[in-house]
């Protein structure tokens, strides 16, 4: 029973860690998407402005070239507007270059570069959500099995069961950590592992069990001490 409970506890621990890891990955991707998507819109807007202003400038330059020289007033107006457009285009192109540099894209990269990265992130997010659903189902299953086995252990001495589980636990936890490392191809994060252990204890009600076992141990120790003291008094009437 003790070994079965500890094996199930290890399964719960693994699922808690994996779900926490998935949650962290989802959060990172969602934050990235919250940046990439608005910046794609901004990039698209810059490209459209550059295209529109370039077309307008080209049209005005052609008009100025064909305009008779004696239309002085119109020539001046065209020159002013062309200068404004030239300045606007320089600023827009500079802003576009900075935006591409921010995301480490090549200077000739287009909106497709943004869309490709966004699509990749969204695909990763979908995969994580699928895995999250799978591990949530597995976690619920492990919790149900744990509750059923715990009910079977109701007739066992809680102190002896607690002590037996404490002996088994270190090896089971080590095996769980190795299983995580094998599955994820990296050592588990100590912080996330600690968090997963706390979540496991919470889900299994381990804190209450431990308090109960410790109280029983203390009570029995006190009983043994009182019995021992009483026995010594009976054996030594003069005292």
What do the PLM-derived regions correspond to, one by one?
Residues 1-239:
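Extended intrinsically disordered terminal tails
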